[in-house]
């Protein structure tokens, strides 16, 4: 999957990339610990969200792996946190709020992350 992600940079317009999975379960839609992303027709992120989903939109499960061009990473790390990033606790919103497009690789990768204690309990059972 990392190799596929790096291939997105063959397009010189791609500055930042990440991965989205089609494996978004019904329970995930209402789980604030599962970050969802919706995309435009070219697989660029429109928004990342934890809750309050728009029923008219299609969402994917965001997999928190990022890739950057060096100059974009330098820019990103020099930017202050945006209000949007702070409010939603999603660092990728800093990029979108500063007009850094995020290209998404779509995968059917199925995974369960452990983000909170409840996830660990569910994993152990």
Task: Report the location of each language-model feature.
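Conserved alpha/beta core of the MobA/IspD/sugar-nucleotide pyrophosphorylase nucleotidyltransferase superfamily
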Residues: 59-125
